[in-house]
Amino acid sequence: NGFLGVGPDSIQLESLLKKAQKMGKKTGIVVNTTLTEATPGAFYAGVTSRKESYTIAKQFTESGVDVAIGAGLSAFINRPDSVDLTATLIEKGYNVYLDWKSVLKTSSDKFVGILSMGDVHRRNKSSNTTAGAADGAEVCLAAKLAAGSEENADTTRLSEPTVYLEKATAKALEVLSRNNQQGFFLMIESAIIDGYGHNNDSDGMIEEMKEFDCTLKQLVAYVNQHPETLLVVTADHETGGTGVTYNSFEVGNPTPLKLSFSTKGHTGTVVPIFAYGAGAEAFAGIIKNTDLPKKIEELMK
């Protein structure tokens, strides 16, 4: 239906991020797509269409998030109302960085990094920038993949996985942990796994999972060092009907793994949920996806 952060009556719902803020916790968002995409947007915005990136960007400036790192500058500056929302963020006390080096070097406790899509995802180095059909916001290949666009991903050369998500996560953890006795809520999204599922791109999905795995190893290490922390990893849905088909292989002759797909859309397949750290036992068994935020909220109290 395209609704984002609102109920059937179009009234905005209170997200986990907002509830964490009410508890006095710091909050952060790290994504390898635009900050106004559906998943990050759902944690701070309330609109009747996920395509309303200009409205979502405006609501981001009112979100109170302490740290945010992602892409999507166009929705903040190339706007129909001619308002420069980066200036609005600065007026609200944020440091705003538009390049990766500044994000890595900053010692600020409150900042927003709005980077190029080429900075946040390896497959955008040579991709063409196009106009979004809905609102004219700039969208590169990764954003189109995340939105489920049909793209011939096989023609895009794979490079080694970047370390963007891992480093951006490390920076967010550094800032949110600093001088903080109340704890924090951090939402991290590896957005393009879904896009490769839509495109039935086995190589892309495998490489993206490798990069995500590096980020998860870092998060597990953080939990080990801060045992009062809870790490929850899951997905909102499965994409592509992904599987590994039966095959015969010659012993001693390594064969690259190829995933199989049954659709280019989302499926109703049950998705896993992994929890580690304080309160992880609450996530055993089969859980309704609408119960997950309730469990997390209780454990944050």
Language model features with spans:
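N-terminal carbohydrate-binding/catalytic regions of secreted carbohydrate-active enzymes
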Residues: 1-7
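A post-motif C-terminal structural segment
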Residues: 32, 36-301
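Mobile, glycine-rich extracellular loop/lid and propeptide segments
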Residues: 10-14, 18-21, 25-39, 60
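Short glycine-rich loop/turn motifs that provide flexible caps or phosphate-binding loops at active sites
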Residues: 4, 27, 268
